[in-house]
Amino acid sequence: MIKFTHLVHHHHDEHHHGEEHTHNTAELTICLTMQERTKSRLKVMLSDGSEAGLFLPRGTVLKEHDIVESDDGVQAMITAAEETVSTVYSDDLLLLAKACYHLGNRHVPLQVEAGWCRYLHDHVLDDMVQRLGLNVKVEQAKYQPEPGAYGGSSAGSHDGHHH
């Protein structure tokens, strides 16, 4: 069984210029849910059907397009699994910001994008968002909440502020 022990490329959402993207040589992929991407020890299934294991440093949170590598140089790219999520689409950005505030106030890991936000489906949260006057679409989609929602690996993620 292949053991992936380190992260060799941490994907960031900036747009790459030129030929930087050609260094992605991983032929294998590992499809994981958001919850699975927060685990440093996990048995996984590779895209070729074989089993492998993640043995990453504690606190590692994987993102889509990250590359993990085994000690003998085998690489695999992480892909985000589609999950049952609630997505709130709105042109009313103030109302959307208020929904994000109320969701964040409940410590809901939240993906925030231009014109929409997304969280793991929860009918109680859906009801709250609908009471604010927004529509909630329950769908199957990839889910990547804002960093920090799972504590990340940086010590003191509250920048010295205490609750």
Curated annotation (Swiss-Prot):
Q: Where in the cell is it found?
A: Cytoplasm
**Per the record, a Pfam family?**
UreE_N
- Any one biological process term the GO annotation gives: protein-containing complex assembly
> Could you confirm whether the keyword Cytoplasm appears in this record?
yes
In its UniProt record, a GO molecular function of this protein is: unfolded protein binding
In terms of superkingdom, the source organism counts as Bacteria
Enumerate the residue ranges of region (Disordered).
144-163
Record's keyword annotation contains Cytoplasm: yes
Q: What does the entry list under GO cellular component?
A: cytoplasm
Functional description taken from the UniProt entry: Involved in urease metallocenter assembly. Binds nickel. Probably functions as a nickel donor during metallocenter assembly.
Similarity annotation: Belongs to the UreE family.
User: What is the protein's given name?
Assistant: Urease accessory protein UreE
Annotated organism of origin? Aliivibrio fischeri (strain MJ11) (Vibrio fischeri)
